Amino acid sequence: MHEIFKKLSNRMVGAMMIHTQLTELFNFIDLEADAKRQKKQLHEESDGLLKLEKYAAQHHHILITSDNPPQVDILNLDILERPNDKLSPDDKIHLIQYALKEWIEWEKKSKVIYEDSYRNLVDMSEIAAADFVLQYVKDVDKELRDAELLYRVRDAIDWDLATIYDKQARLSK
């Protein structure tokens, strides 16, 4: 069970890294509402990690530490070396698409890890622990659905920057 919790912990630390970097990226291209969404996800991941650590300690008497989180570096792009005001509209569209694709791929992989963890706990007859982990499965499933919907909505408007920025302004109020 310790290894299952450690795998979840490592993934959550990685999730905090990706949401931090997505927040930075969206702030860089002035997508304030998207940055706020990522910051909210960052806080939810942090809370989830603390709940996992508390659950493991109080219910299973084990201390879990993140010793091998995935290395996340989505900001390692040449385009980000330029000042924001030197980015073309196409550059910004590319960055938005890139960020959303990275987020979606991260959540897809997270969902597999969480579902496998749930399944392994059920197989071990650790039903209470599996039930605890099931909430993470549901959370990542919802986050994945939201990320995919955001991508589809923006794709449906053909990545029109004026519309995207207008909606950001309305959502940020």
Give names to the regions the model predicted:
Residues 1-173:
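Iron-associated oxidoreductase/ferritin-like identity signal
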